[in-house]
Amino acid sequence: MASRQISLALGFLAFLWAVLGAQNKTEEVQCRLMAKFNLSGYVDAKNHSLVIAGLFPIHSRIIPVDEAILEPVSPMCEGFNFRGFRWMKTMIHTIKEINERKDILPNHTLGYQIFDSCYTISKAMESSLVFLTGQEEFKPNFRNSTGSTLAALVGSGGSSLSVAASRILGLYYMPQVGYTSSCSILSDKFQFPSYLRVLPSDNLQSEAIVNLIKHFGWVWVGAIAADDDYGKYGVKTFKEKMESANLCVAFSETIPKVYSNEKMQKAVKAVKTSTAKVIVLYTSDIDLSLFVLEMIHHNITDRTWIATEAWITSALIAKPEYFPYFGGTIGFATPRSVIPGLKEFLYDVHPNKDPNDVLTIEFWQTAFNCTWPNSSVPYNVDHRVNMTGKEDRLYDMSDQLCTGEEKLEDLKNTYLDTSQLRITKQCKQAVYAIAHGLDHLSRCQEGQGPFGSNQQCAYIPTFDFWQLMYYMKEIKFKSHEDKWVILDDNGDLKNGHYDVLNWHLDDEGEISFVTVGRFNFRSTNFELVIPTNSTIFWNTESSRRPDSFCTQVCPPGTRKGIRQGQPICCFDCIPCADGYVSEKSGQRECDPCGEDDWSNAGKSKCVPKLVEFLAYGEALGFTLVILSIFGALVVLAVTVVYVIHRHTPLVKANDRELSFLIQMSLVITVLSSLLFIGKPCNWSCMARQITLALGFCLCLSSILGKTISLFFAYRISVSKTRLISMHPIFRKLIVLVCVVGEIGVCAAYLVLEPPRMFKNIEIQNVKIIFECNEGSVEFLCSIFGFDVLRALLCFLTTFVARQLPDNYYEGKCITFGMLVFFIVWISFVPAYLSTKGKFKVAVEIFAILASSYGLLGCLFLPKCFIILLRPKRNTDETVGGRVPTVDRSIQLTSASVSSELNSTTVSTVLDE
């Protein structure tokens, strides 16, 4: 029995040993942090129901780890940042202020756990892991190291740090509210679902910068960015907006996060060699500090810098000794504010309050350049390589001991400067945003909540992060300035403005940030306001606004000619073509002038075209008018002579009626040339051709009547036979038929397709030639074709009858008249076709006058000569001639011919 009990006891012990061994084995394989992170900061979580985490760049960098050490090491930090220290103190001050209020979280108090991010991604990620796990936990339990509920994070003090932290915290949907991270990628809710911020995105800042560039007329701007998310995405957005505005980025370089002489010199070279005099700097003050030293080292002073909100008010850059190089900097900053009670809270800091507060000790040592007694806290340490890249710069601890009696009132540093509380104000608003979200969550009424089908509520401290995010997305509250803080769907500040700041040097030799304008934004509406009376300091030799262009703006009269393979701001100025103008400077294309206008000599303005037509007032027109009137007077003079001597044998032998018709037609043709002179109009275009055609028709028809009479007379003299009588009525009938036929064709011409006036702008671009469009070419050719046919018949009949008796030379006169007529109009054709404008009209008038003068001279001047100067030859015996040589026995006088013809029924009558 005893042995049995012993066996059972041994078995139980074996079982217990196996179970405990298995448990120990399980614990050994549990996931845990491999080592503790070297983090510094502040914590106050005891006796508080909620804790807000904070990440602030209290230091500006980490100390490089010795590459010989193989084991992973959490690096130390260096480069105390007074600005980041003030932001951290502002968070603590705000939490204490909220805890004292009764209208926000009345039944709860807030604690905090704040870590120093050292402005380094690795430290931001270390801190994020600790926020989720604590340094001793095996897995995330959403409690900090004090055990209180972690609600949200304020931070992380830089875009790249916020991106890194949010990629970890976003996995658990932990709310993160940024106070200075403006990188546009953080607006992407797919990548960063739980990130919010109380400042606008860089999309708006880039929009503001481009508007500023456009306002000052700059088109060629350089860009330099930090080699991080803030710089890369900022410049990317800036370039896109510059391209949309048809502006150009001359160069784009980066400032290395870890000093690289090669990369830094590349950026410096771009600044020195580029023609761009305006440069945008997308970087933080910490990253910019070394670049500033490079600018000073290379003595680059003639540049205008456009600053972003990350460094525009930074005391690290805005030092009086930097003003010759960066004076006149212009840029954007979020609105500044006055925070009640903050200044007193900032002064309430002293190492004696907590001997273990290493950050306060380092602050004191750095501020007063002394060493705190019995402290091993280093300060003023800089392990970065200098600009030569060949040596380290290390500042040892001061031999002077701190007494503790030093007065903060004697300091002039960023920490105590409360005149430019811009990002500091945003730290306060970030804390309040979380507090208001928690307050809304705590006020949920059971059965009226937003969660689940039962409208459940979430409760403190058991809520989940995603439940708090529901309220954070809907956040809307009034700040301490009584201004609304509203976030949009991307978690960015929806409404607000940027101040436009300009760096001046005040009377005390310090840099002052002068507000010269503002950029208002409300949803998608933007407005840049810079009053004309704003006092802007420009760091140029002339103290005037600088120009920044690749190619100077093309003057009026030229257009931009894009250079192949170069930005659109680099171009050649090409003169506008004839007929095109550019009235403004910098036009891309020349504008065509209107139909009635033409470009001036400078191609800068459209001027009315010169109007050309054969005017009465010009020399050529006046000469032709004189010739026309003179010709008409000569014809009238001949008519007077004929009327006075109408009973003389010579006039009677020339058929007086037909002669008068010829004289009248010559007056018509000569005076019709006046219709070709002067500014054409529709009625004159129709009248000129019709009048000319009818005049020539009457003239040639009358001549044709005469030539037929001569032809019959010649046939009688040759054949000695009696022909059919040519009674005078038949000659008149020939004239009537020809004229009536011509009138019919002209009427059809005017009705169907009449000539019209039109403005010819094709022959000479600089002129508008007023001329007549002759309408139907077929009708016009038909009309004048009939005249040519009549002239040809006249010539043929008179040519046959040219051998009538010598003293009777009517046939010869008509023959010569027709020859002159043909010569003139045959010569007219090539001359007319080879001339343009008013000279073409002058050629036509000359042909009309020449042919009219030719007919007048050949038909009437010889007879007038006899009538007026040789009256003795104006007798029946003299006027009658001899029969041609083929039959000299036949004498043909006017009397004998008349007697002979009148004595028979078949005869040819030469006269009545």
Curated annotation (Swiss-Prot):
Write out the transmembrane intervals: 624-644, 658-678, 692-712, 733-753, 779-799, 813-833, 841-861
Q: What taxonomic lineage is listed for the species of origin?
A: Eukaryota, Metazoa, Chordata, Craniata, Vertebrata
Name of this protein: Vomeronasal type-2 receptor 1
Q: Which PANTHER family match?
A: CALCIUM-SENSING RECEPTOR-RELATED, VOMERONASAL TYPE-2 RECEPTOR 1
Other notes: The variant protein sequence is capable of binding the sex pheromone, 2-octanamine (2-1, methyl heptyl) via aa 11-17.
Check the UniProt entry and state the signal peptide residues, or none.
Answer: 1-21
User: Which Gene3D superfamilies does the annotation name?
Assistant: 3.40.50.2300, GPCR, family 3, nine cysteines domain
> Which Pfam families does the record match to this protein?
7tm_3, ANF_receptor, NCD3G
Which keywords appear in this protein's UniProt record, sorted alphabetically? Answer: Cell membrane, G-protein coupled receptor, Glycoprotein, Membrane, Pheromone response, Receptor, Signal, Transducer, Transmembrane, Transmembrane helix
Stretches in topological domain Extracellular? 22-623, 679-691, 754-778, 834-840
BP-aspect Gene Ontology terms: neuron differentiation; response to pheromone
